Amino acid sequence: MAAHTIFTTTSTTNSFLFPIASSNTNSAPSLSSSFHGVSLKVKSKTPQSLTLSSVTSPKPFIVFAATKKAVAVLKGTSNVEGVVTLTQDDDGPTTVKVRITGLAPGLHGFHLHEFGDTTNGCMSTGPHFNPNGLTHGAPGDEVRHAGDLGNIEANASGVAEATLVDNQIPLSGPNSVVGRALVVHELEDDLGKGGHELSLTTGNAGGRLACGVVGLTPI
């Protein structure tokens, strides 16, 4: 890479002649100048080149990826309860780890709802989180609510454990899910394909068994 040139200044010396009176009016004039007298040295400034390598370069600005983590503790009016953790690295997808107990064996709709309001139990958490104004669908569908997380399956002991990865439920930014509520439902979510009048809004997943507000937690 060719060196860049930066101009600085340094001192050099120029000479100027100042006339002085001569005591001999009959002297012939000098052939080298119309003046004669003493010289005075005056400093002036001329540019001098300096390569960029001799200048201290600023240190690069480094941005570190930030990991964010949140948790929701689910409770309801029945014996259904659970803990859900959400983790996001930088601006990547969010990983959701679910463990819920007290469920009937089988599939249960699992959604993120718009509000973190549980003053009236899970009913006051509002509809599915849907910032794009789309209809209900499966997690892998192009047309879906951001809060459509599909189904979780409870075993014969009523325990559902699952790990979900989704890129529509970030923990920061304008569509952050922090402060909203996770809800587990009574029935299987038909993923918008059941043909029921509620299929395109709730997946016809039935009642809300337990819910919890998503809150940030230390890493």
Curated annotation (Swiss-Prot):
Subunit structure: Homotetramer.
Essential cofactor(s): Cu cation; Zn(2+)
Free-text function comment from the UniProt entry: Destroys radicals which are normally produced within the cells and which are toxic to biological systems.
Pfam family, one: Sod_Cu
Record-linked SUPFAM superfamilies: Cu,Zn superoxide dismutase-like
GO molecular function: copper ion binding; superoxide dismutase activity
One GO CC annotation: chloroplast
First-level EC class: oxidoreductase
Reaction equations catalysed: 2 superoxide + 2 H(+) = H2O2 + O2
Cysteines engaged in disulfide bonds, as pairs: 122-211
Primary subcellular site in the record, as a coarse category: plastid
Protein origin, superkingdom: Eukaryota
Residues annotated as binding Cu cation: 111, 113, 128, 185
Protein name: Superoxide dismutase [Cu-Zn], chloroplastic
Organelle targeting peptide span: 1-65
Binding note for cofactor: Binds 1 copper ion per subunit. Binds 1 zinc ion per subunit.
Annotated localization: Plastid, Chloroplast
InterPro entries cross-referenced by the UniProt entry: SOD-like_Cu/Zn_dom_sf, SOD_Cu/Zn_/chaperone, SOD_Cu/Zn_BS, SOD_Cu_Zn_dom
Keywords of this entry: Antioxidant, Chloroplast, Copper, Disulfide bond, Metal-binding, Oxidoreductase, Plastid, Transit peptide, Zinc
Enzyme Commission number(s): 1.15.1.1
Binding residues annotated for Zn(2+), in chain numbering: 128, 136, 145, 148
Family, per entry: Belongs to the Cu-Zn superoxide dismutase family.
